[in-house]
Amino acid sequence: MTEHKCIAIDGPAGAGKSTVAKKVAQKLNLLYIDTGAMYRAVTLKALRERINLWDDIALIELAKRTIITLLAGQKQSVLLDGLDVTREIRTPEVTNNVSIVAKIAGVREVLVQRQREMAEEAGVVMDGRDIGTVVLPKAKAKFFLTASAEERARRRAKEMMNFGYDVDLEQLIKEIEERDFMDSNRAVSPLVPAEDAVLIDSSGMTIDEVVNSIITWVEKGK
């Protein structure tokens, strides 16, 4: 596996992983892979097909027959079975249910294998919750981004408003705290920093400051 070309960026919901990872990828001329979008796509399909989200077997089979394509561009597009669902995977319904789907071991096995295959094909910047610990454990550059729940809720609110959704900030804070608990306490691939990850608390930092910090660390590690 060409993990020496890969940068792993992990962290909780709303930590700014995707925005930061995109910019890092652009500056270093690497492919950006949003693994969270893949779990969101499976969740969206399950909701559309009215599959019981507590039926692990049904969801594993769903993941196996789901084709997810990530298209590079200024704003990465996500295709679900050939159809653009970039906006649909960011709905509150998907956001509130994706942790249920993501904690299923069989679903993770299917998607992790696909993520590793992507990393085999090209140097990548990959963000998620278990990239440095599970997906690309031998990646030379690993980062763990975090920020306060309030800061992350404000960022998520801005993202949702950009997609045209109404936002209740207090409710968002509550949902983020609940998701943190679920992600950190799940039996499979819990949200924890890799032992060799660089920890970055982005509270009060601009996106560009975080990006430059990561690039500085990457350049040092060459």
Curated annotation (Swiss-Prot):
GO terms for cellular component: cytosol. One of its GO terms (biological process) is nucleobase-containing small molecule interconversion. SUPFAM superfamilies: P-loop containing nucleoside triphosphate hydrolases. GO terms for molecular function: ATP binding; CMP kinase activity; dCMP kinase activity. Keywords: ATP-binding, Cytoplasm, Kinase, Nucleotide-binding, Transferase. ATP binds at G11, P12, A13, G14, A15, G16, K17, S18, T19. Pfam families: Cytidylate_kin. The keyword Membrane does not apply. It catalyses: CMP + ATP = CDP + ADP; dCMP + ATP = dCDP + ADP. Gene3D superfamilies: P-loop containing nucleotide triphosphate hydrolases. Its EC number is 2.7.4.25. It is an enzyme of class 2 (transferase). The keyword Cytoplasm applies. InterPro entries: Cytidylate_kin (IPR003136), Cytidylate_kinase_dom (IPR011994), P-loop_NTPase (IPR027417). It is found in: Cytoplasm. Its main location: cytoplasm. HAMAP family: Cytidyl_kinase_type1. Belongs to the cytidylate kinase family. Type 1 subfamily. This is Cytidylate kinase. It comes from Desulforamulus reducens (strain ATCC BAA-1160 / DSM 100696 / MI-1) (Desulfotomaculum reducens). The lineage of its organism: Bacteria, Bacillati, Bacillota, Clostridia, Eubacteriales. The gene is cmk.
